[in-house]
Amino acid sequence: MIKALEDDLSQTFDIHFNNHALLDEAFTQASYVNEHPHQELKFYERIEFLGDAVLQLIVSEYLFKRYPEMPQGKLTRLRAAMVCEASFSDFAKECHFDQYIRLGKGEEKSGARQRSSLLCDIFESFIGALYLDQGRAAVERFVRIVIFPKLDEGKFDHIIDHKSELQELLQKNGDVEIDYELVSEEGPENDLIFTVSVTADHKKLATGTGHSKKVAEQNAANQALQLLRRPK
């Protein structure tokens, strides 16, 4: 099972572990260890502890740099949404990690392999193992593939919502007409890039791009916010 995981990591992410025991530990649950007492196995909880801390730091730094104007409270809410159980569980399934967990027979029968809390733990423990094996740079490369693109895909728009923020800023002194207009669609049909402009009382403020009109509108609003908040 671990050999299949190594092949998957190699083909999908170009990740090659040096210390294979770390990968074994990261994907082994306590129930499996208890059923194999003579194999001197370790389970994932200690590595998970480390992975959680590494993810918190890397995601925090990324958000801090990506959104230089975002208030601390909103940064905290956005980070909480990105590093929560539901998000990590989704990321684990996207990476096929659920296929490679070593479980005891009882846990397997109970459906633990698809349990959100376990998948979250496994994602964190994998990050911990990758950090121990190859350092922070390797973890950053991985999360730039798996986690950060979700921001551009609109997964966390319910927290960011630059459009509402822009509306509040522009209309604090009276009514302002804000419009979003599709400027262009470029690229192949299965990978379109949309460009949207945002105007206030028919005056163009900024443009934004994204893989959907919704995301492009949010990015246009974010660009407008940054321009409006710059010191004059």
Swiss-Prot record:
EC number(s) stated in the UniProt entry for this protein:
3.1.26.3
What's the protein here called?
Ribonuclease 3
Task: Provide the DRBM domain boundaries.
Answer: 161-230
| Residues covered by the RNase III domain | 2-135
Q: Which NCBIfam families match?
A: RNaseIII (TIGR02191)
Name where it's found.
Cytoplasm
**Stretches that traverse the bilayer:** none
Q: Which transformation does this protein catalyse, written as a reaction?
A: Endonucleolytic cleavage to 5'-phosphomonoester
Q: What does this protein do?
A: Digests double-stranded RNA. Involved in the processing of primary rRNA transcript to yield the immediate precursors to the large and small rRNAs (23S and 16S). Processes some mRNAs, and tRNAs when they are encoded in the rRNA operon. Processes pre-crRNA and tracrRNA of type II CRISPR loci if present in the organism.
Top-tier EC class: hydrolase
Annotated positions binding Mg(2+): E48, D121, E124
Task: Describe, as the record does, how this protein assembles with itself and its partners.
Answer: Homodimer.
